[in-house]
Amino acid sequence: MFLNSFIKLIIIFSATSLLLGCKADSLEIKLSDKDIQSAIAGEAVAIDFEAEFSMLGELDDENKATLDQLLVLAEEFLSLDDFEIAKGDFGAKVFLEGSIPLTANPEEESPWYVSVSPYDSEFYIVQLKTGTKFDRLESAMSDINFLLSADPFHPIKYKLKAPGSTVIAPAVEIGGITHLY
């Protein structure tokens, strides 16, 4: 009886470790005022992103196989430039670099995209959203492991180059100093 409970606990812990790997620890998106203006004008714009994921526990053969399947899936749904796995203090760290669309089109297909939408006559809202292929990605991840799912929301840091522009944000970091508004 104790052995059965222990095995179930290990399975739950392993599944939780993989599940935690589906929400980015950090997501950095780089864009400029010119990118935003181009997207508003209806042009196709791709902006760079960097994401970091953590996996708790040891990177054994089973987890490596799952990561390989997730990488193939990510390459199918995302535009990736680089993929790296590094050993961390408490498990593996996965780093992804690539590009995602920046668009004013609310019907964007990509699983994730950066949306630009009017706020009032002078300002625009820039935010990460999920596109029409998000549900397909989530379903494909569940096919790999029924406990896996993509997370629609991630902690985001925008790196914006917009000299002379007015930006309204609840919190910003300028020159390494954080400001809350």
Where does each model-flagged region fall?
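Short N-terminal edge-element motif at the start of the domain
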Residues: 24-35, 58-74, 78-80
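Mature, soluble, non-transmembrane domains
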Residues: 72-181
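C-terminal motif of bacterial Sec signal peptides marking the signal peptidase cleavage site
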Residues: 20-21
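Post-signal peptide N-terminal segment of mature Sec-exported envelope proteins
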Residues: 30-51
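Post-signal-peptide N-terminal segment of Sec-exported extracytoplasmic proteins
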Residues: 44-73, 136-148, 152
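Bacterial N-terminal signal peptides that target proteins for export
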Residues: 1-10
